[in-house]
Amino acid sequence: MEDFVRQCFNPMIVELAEKAMKEYGEDPKIETNKFAAICTHLEVCFMYSDFHFIDERGESIIVESGDPNALLKHRFEIIEGRDRTMAWTVVNSICNTTGVEKPKFLPDLYDYKENRFIEIGVTRREVHIYYLEKANKIKSEKTHIHIFSFTGEEMATKADYTLDEESRARIKTRLFTIRQEMASRGLWDSFVSPREAKRQLKKDLKLQEPCADSQTKVSHRTSPALKTLEPMWMDSNRTAALRASFLKCPKK
């Protein structure tokens, strides 16, 4: 699973996921399913935000490539992926500036057009079940919830899906591709089932034991699907700034 994650996701996403896990004392090399889940969630958050802007008239527009000097503001503020201290600093700043109610839990995004925080969910289960779990945890009508599944289903607060259909289709296609690639490598069942994941971990540990009689060959071949759908989703004009902002280590 670890090899798959490093091949499948943008290096910045992988770096952010590793940083987040280490912040909570978790090891990406051991908890590989969580590593994959965090990377997937991060990527969906970035895809949700990418190419969506607000123009000088306050209208929401989609710009994939255009005049870099245009007076455009990113529609979404990305909160997910930052260390907790910086994330709360961003949330507090937004609340002080806009007057919106401060959430009890860290949200994933802030939508400057609709003036609301957004909680993004990516589930391997039924979307309505995961939606209810999120809603019961957050207990706030102010935070908008949007859930995606690996099967192409989605569910959002008051059926308000925020994004246009094409943008949401990009996210669904990416999730479906991840699922298909995991399945083709025999990783999907363990990703869905914790019990199967434990069995797979024991199996992997046994395979990693030194053996005098044989050598293990590791294939780094990338499948045609991954070559075609490698994560080129990230807004290139934003990548450098995000990397500097998100990966900056706080001074201790």
UniProtKB/Swiss-Prot annotation:
InterPro entries with a match to the protein in the record: PA/PA-X (IPR001009), PA/PA-X_sf (IPR038372)
Organism taxonomic ancestry: Viruses, Riboviria, Orthornavirae, Negarnaviricota, Polyploviricotina
Residues under site feature: Important for efficient shutoff activity: 202-203, 206
Record remark: domains: The probable endonuclease active site in the N-terminus and the basic amino acid cluster in the C-terminus are important for the shutoff activity. The C-terminus acts as a nuclear localization signal. The C-terminus is recruited to host protein complexes involved in nuclear Pol II RNA processing.
Keywords: Decay of host mRNAs by virus, Eukaryotic host gene expression shutoff by virus, Host cytoplasm, Host gene expression shutoff by virus, Host mRNA suppression by virus, Host nucleus, Host-virus interaction
GO molecular-function terms, A-Z: RNA binding
Protein name listed in UniProt: Protein PA-X
Main subcellular location: host cell
Site feature: Important for efficient shutoff activity and nuclear localization: 195, 198-199
Active site positions: 80, 108
Species name: Influenza A virus (strain A/Gull/Minnesota/945/1980 H13N6)
Similarity comment text for this entry: Belongs to the influenza viruses PA-X family.
GO annotation, biological process: viral RNA genome replication; viral translational frameshifting
Entry function: Plays a major role in the shutoff of the host protein expression by cleaving mRNAs probably via an endonuclease activity. This host shutoff allows the virus to escape from the host antiviral response. Hijacks host RNA splicing machinery to selectively target host RNAs containing introns for destruction. This may explain the preferential degradation of RNAs that have undergone co- or post-transcriptional processing.
